Amino acid sequence: MPFKIIASQCTSCSACEPLCPNVAISEKGGNFVIEAAKCSECVGHFDEPQCAAACPVDNTCVVDRALPRYQAPV
């Protein structure tokens, strides 16, 4: 499942944006968003999702359970 950013909790510090290996995080209208189609949960790059690890606000970068889990290409 890709991650999403809870806009109401995001401080727009941008700590997450440069860490995303898939360039899935961008700023739109003053808020940071994760493009679900690009998010791989950092599988194959890191042991844990970098957006969640870098975010200074707990539970702001979270799994978007409404979308299917990322599957690495075979």
Swiss-Prot record:
Its cofactor is [4Fe-4S] cluster. Binds 2 [4Fe-4S] clusters. InterPro entries: 4Fe4S_Fe-S-bd, 4Fe4S_Fe_S_CS. [4Fe-4S] cluster 1 binds at residues 10, 13, 16, 55. It comes from the Bacteria. Residues 2-30 form the 4Fe-4S ferredoxin-type domain. One of its GO terms (biological process) is nitrogen fixation. Pfam families: Fer4. One of its GO terms (cellular component) is cytoplasm. [4Fe-4S] cluster 2 binds at residues 20, 39, 51. Keywords: 4Fe-4S, Electron transport, Iron, Iron-sulfur, Metal-binding, Nitrogen fixation, Repeat, Transport. This is Ferredoxin-like protein in nif region. The gene is frxA.
